[in-house]
Amino acid sequence: MSEGRKLVSIRGLTVSSAHRVLIKSLDLDIAQGELLGIAGESGSGKTMLMRTLLNIPPEDVHFKADALQMFGADCLHLSDTEWRRTVGEHIGFVPQNTMFYLHPMLKIRQQIADSYVSHRKGTLRQGLARAEALLREVGFDDPERVLNSYAWELSGGMRQRVNIAMALMNSPELLIADEPTTALDCAIQRQIMDLFMKISRDTGIAIVMISHDLGMLQQYSRRTLVMYAGRMVESGSTETLFCTPAHPYTRALMGVSPSLSLQAGQRLAEIPGYVPDSGRETDACIFAPRCPYAGAECSTALQEQDLGGGHSCLCAKPGIGGHDHG
């Protein structure tokens, strides 16, 4: 990848709960400075992938991998404490729920500098000075008022800006944004996404954007990965993915992305069927029950197809039906 050195490299990641597979045999690289989008419906495994990376899996969920390296560390041989320290020092996280990281009973100033101090980046006074500067950078004209506010006194868009400032406190090399504009109106959504682009330009950090809306990723990411039922079904440059989508699920997802397909007064389309939460251990195509092009070959073990130029697809018939979405 041209952006820079690899910050994260994962090979053969499988995530499971006690009774089912959640993510199967997934490979992922994240390069320095890149803008990476990860798309898929709810239940596709996008958030579970990032929670595994951040070492905050749900209870009773475990993983195995052939390799998992981050920022020069071999995470397979780190203790939980060492892994969390690596995450805290190198990764900033912006959650989907704007209240997720903000304690309702504590003022913003009481929580925004915690990670900065705990990772020995500086004193509390230095942390608050940095917080004030970052709050200005994310668009607040009155950072002192924000620092003295409770989360419930701020609007959803303001809370998300606070979350972004918190994620930047430790000068991370990687920022992960999990559906960062959910529940925000369209104008605020665009402001938040434009803010991520400004952060990328100003700091050069890598940003991973998780979204169900491919149209949003088309505007803001340079490389896009499409996940379905715990698998990476297609990946490539965002331009290539949108010009020549190879997997039927990618094309179906384009058809239900609000910013790509929805006209004024029109009801959003849906992909028939649902994302399965069981049976993910199969080597066959798990999208086949929902795919209009499924055939006998889709019930055999799939191999990833290298389509050239960094474009790959997990499909027995890559490119089939492409004329439908030309």
Model region roles, listed by residue range:
Residues E144-R145, S237-G326:
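Short catalytic/signature loops enriched in Gly
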Residues P180, L184-Q266:
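P-loop NTP-binding/switch modules centered on Walker-like glycine-rich loops
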Residues I112, I164, L175, I188, ...:
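Hydrophobic anchor residue at the start of the ABC signature
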Residues A39-E41:
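The feature captures the beta-strand-to-loop junction immediately N-terminal to the Walker
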